[in-house]
Amino acid sequence: MTAKTKETIGVGTRSVPLSNPDKELFPDDGITKAELADYYRTVARPMLPHLKDRPLVMERYPDGFQGKSFFHKDVPDYFPEWIRTVQVPKEGGSVTMAVCDDAATLVYLANQACITPHPWLSRADCLDCPDRLVFDLDPSEHDGDGFETVRWSARQLGDLLTELGLRPAVMTTGSRGLHLLVLLDRRTDFDTARHFARRVADVLAARHSDRLTTEPRKNKRRGRLYLDTQRNAYAQTSVAPYAVRARPHAPVATPLEWNELDDPGLGPRQWTLRTLPERLEKDGDPWKGLSRCRRSLTAAEQRLDAL
């Protein structure tokens, strides 16, 4: 048995430990833990605004993406003191969760074989008040038209949200579908936000009942795309933009420009750990100005009532 190797990777002013760097997390592609860590160091600038100040759930794969995995909420005792943590209340006590405020933390999580970080939809200083809504466009497993229905659905939902005075953004999930994201001003609670999201989805599904549904039970969807709004609840998470997914070839959840939905070749796993950095270098971050798009739900609710 060979001894495990250790090295360090420089991230800002910190030297982050990297154990067993040659461990292959995606064996078919030869993608190692060191390559995962380097990827997250590379994309930290556009990714961190979507992680900062948020409790984080770590999706870990110690034996590679095809091996046993687990969602890790509580911070282990061995985590270094420089990683920020937050006490999150739960029934009967609390849980200590990591907060990824800097690139060094992001790289350290990669060393823990955290392939995919999942942040909360609210921030640590006001856990009950979401600052984003997420709509998950989940295609039918029997959808035979490729990704066309998902692209069409994103357009329809984006138009409706814009009609309500909101500023939605769209990204591939790196898995099966697309996410639409709406930034909020934190003046509402989760119950209100979730109810609003479900009403929006219901309106759109009623307009296109032959293609869309809000039915969570798969056997009731009859081949229609599922408009999933269930992530919009306290303690729920959503995959972070630019996060790697535990799927073949290490696809990445990728923010898009809206006009990219016009590309018939677009797919949910279009970009990977190895191709995304080149996209960023060439085209920049499509969501660079997203923080200026925060909106209140109050006016949007009034417009929705009037439909």
Place the predicted regions along the sequence by residue:
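Class II aminoacyl-tRNA synthetase-like tRNA-binding/catalytic domains
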Residues: 78-104
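Signature for HUH/AEP ssDNA processing cores
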Residues: 96-176, 184-192, 305
